Regions:
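A broad, low-specificity signal marking well-ordered, structured residues that form hydrophobic/aromatic
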Residues: 54, 83, 120
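Catalytic cores and adjacent binding grooves of peptidoglycan-active enzymes
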Residues: 79, 87-153
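Extended, low-complexity, intrinsically disordered C-terminal regulatory tails
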Residues: 41-70
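Extracytoplasmic cell-surface/polysaccharide-interacting catalytic and binding patches
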Residues: 1-48, 139-153
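Single, functionally critical "micro-switch" positions that shape active/binding sites
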Residues: 61, 76, 122
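Amphipathic alpha-helical interface surfaces
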Residues: 36-43, 65, 81, 92, ...
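Active-site microenvironments of hydrolase-like enzyme catalytic domains
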Residues: 69-84
C-alpha cells in the first residue's frame, strides 16, 4: 500500500527483529495506517523531496515488537505516529534535523545514538492530544520545537 509518493506501508512494518523473533508486525487498525500516511505526507515526504531517498530504521511497531526492542510503553511507534530515520553521516543528520525542525507537523524530534550509530526519531500526531505526556528521553538527546527544553545533536 502506497502511503505517499515515495513511501510504502511495507517500509514501516519491516523489521529484522520481528523476523528473527517470529513476530508478525502488521498494523491492526485503519487508524494506524492513517497515522503513518499523515507522518509520510507531512514530515517524511518533504524530507525526501529535499534530500533524496531516506531509510526508515523503525516505523510501526506492534506491542510485542515494541516490548522486544525495549520501546517505552506509550511509544508513538505503536500508533503509527513515529519513525526512526537512518543517518548516512552525522553531517547529513544535522541537515535532516535542521530541516525537520521547520516543519509545523513535527511533534517530537529526538537525536539518538548508541555507540557510533546515530538516528533521528521524529513523530507527528494526526489527532492532537490536548495534554500530551512528556516522552521518555531514553538516553538520547531531546529536541522539540514545541517544548522549552532544547539540546543540539
Amino acid at each position: 500500500m502506497q502511503l505517499s509518493n515515495n513511501f510504502r506501508l511495507s517500509e514501516f512494518t519491516r523489521s529484522d527483529t520481528a523476523k528473527r523473533l517470529g513476530i508478525v508486525n502488521e498494523c491492526s487498525s485503519v487508524e494506524q495506517v492513517l497515522n503513518l500516511a499523515y507522518l509520510c505526507h507531512m514530515v517524511l515526504q518533504p524530507l525526501r523531496d529535499r534530500f533524496g531517498p531516506i531509510r526508515i530504521n523503525s516505523g510501526y511497531r506492534c506491542p510485542e515488537l515494541n516490548s522486544a526492542v525495549g520501546g517505552v510503553k506509550n511509544s508513538q511507534h505503536m500508533r503509527g505516529e513515529a519513525a526512526d530515520i537512518h543517518l548516512p553521516s552525522v553531517e547529513i543528520g544535522k541537515e535532516y534535523f535542521a530541516f525537520l525542525k521547520t516543519l509545523p507537523a513535527v511533534d517530537e524530534l529526538i537525536w539518538e545514538r548508541k555507540g557510533n550509530t546515530h538516528w533521528i526519531h521524529v513523530s507527528a500526531r494526526r489527532v492532537k492530544d490536548p495534554s500530551p505526556a512528556l516522552p521518555s528521553m531514553g538516553g538520547g538527546s531531546y529536541n522539540s520545537k514545541h517544548r522549552a527544553s532544547k539540546l543540539s545533536p
